[in-house]
Amino acid sequence: MADINAIMQEIKKGVAEIIDFARIETLIKNYYDNGANFYIKAGFDPTAPDLHLGHTVVLNKMALLQKHGGIVQFLIGDFTAKIGDPTGKSATRKILDDETIAKNAKTYKEQVFKILDESKTEVMFNSTWLSTLGADGLIALASTFNVARMLERDDFTKRYKNETPIAISEFLYPLLQGYDSVAMKCDIEMGGTDQKFNLLMGRTLGRTYGIGKEQAIIMMPLLVGLDGVNKMSKSLGNYIGVTENPNDIFAKTLSISDELMWVWYELLSSKSIDEISNLKLSVQKGETHPKKAKEDLALEITARFYDEQIAANAKSEFDKVHSKKELPSDMPEFEMNTDEVWIVEALSYCGLSSSNAEARRHIKANAVSIDQQKIRDEQLKLTKGEYILQVGKRTYAKLKVV
């Protein structure tokens, strides 16, 4: 017999807020008593399709619910992507074209099943019902809410006070997201804490449209990125992508602070609350070294997107390069046909910097090495020969000037 209390404790792990906990417990119990599945919705606008660990906080919890009777309704907001979620934005977002949306949606589908059970997942597109809503339906939807309530949102309030334009279409976004819940008739909706206004809209519209059930809500914290300060974001560069190579996933995870490690354990690890507490106590007592705890976390995260053997290989590679100070075995190789090349251009050519300006910054920061020797001369020229270029601790390239 399933231990419902233990399952609910596992579901609560790392959660920021649950609305209608009793309903979720009833759904779980009904599954084990009667075999009745329930539906979990999470929406993703395909504006930036490459998933990173921040996205997996919600996806991991959905994968857990799949083990206890949940059918995930993975909603790709191809229609709402034409508006763009205004949450946290200080200006109106650029509208994406259909071709870009379709391409990004395909990328999502390729990546999400690294985490979710495909056999218990329904991929849905909100254009299915929103594109046929029509003017009458849109007017009816818009009449369910008022501008004063919309302006309760912090981002809209700030923009209104600063006289920054707010498009009418942006007011429609939370309404359309809420209507998704009406159309999908989900039992649970999931999202980050920054989505609370939009998530509550689904409950409100469920009552308005009388769909017969009110969705419960599970809100997850926003994952703090590698810098230990800001939420994980591609634009800030403090992220780990789920499709990155295993060596980078392992090494980047090891780079986080000891303090942040425990937050990541709670939000990204499959360990139970008790297991994490015991590990933390062991570290505090000096029985387990913090580096060992962090290595175990890095192994678990890397294995989730690859497998345990590949994760172990990534650890061996890290030890080889960083502990034994040996060169990585999988360096990319480049060749330049010239008598000599400026070091700044060489770094850009080999992909070790995104621009000449960034290459100069790396050199000034003492982050560039040639053949494992630091350099500070940004005017340096490389003549014919072979060189090992390095930026920072983890990025290498082999360059042959011929």
Give the positions of each predicted feature.
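Positively charged, low-complexity intrinsically disordered leader regions
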Residues: 1-41
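Divalent-metal (Mg2+/Mn2+/Ca2+)-assisted nucleotide/phosphate chemistry catalytic cores
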Residues: 15, 97-219, 224-226
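N-terminal catalytic cores of NTP/NDP-binding nucleotidyl/phosphoryl-transfer enzymes
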Residues: 26-85, 190-196
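Buried hydrophobic packing segments
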Residues: 58-62, 175, 198-206, 301, ...
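Short acidic, glycine/serine/threonine-rich loops at helix termini
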Residues: 84-88, 133-139, 228-232
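A charged helix-plus-loop insertion that forms the helical arch/lid used to bind
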Residues: 86-102
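Short, hinge-like loop/turn segments at secondary-structure boundaries
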Residues: 89-94, 140-143, 236
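Conserved nucleotide- and phosphate/pyrophosphate-binding catalytic cores
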Residues: 205-402
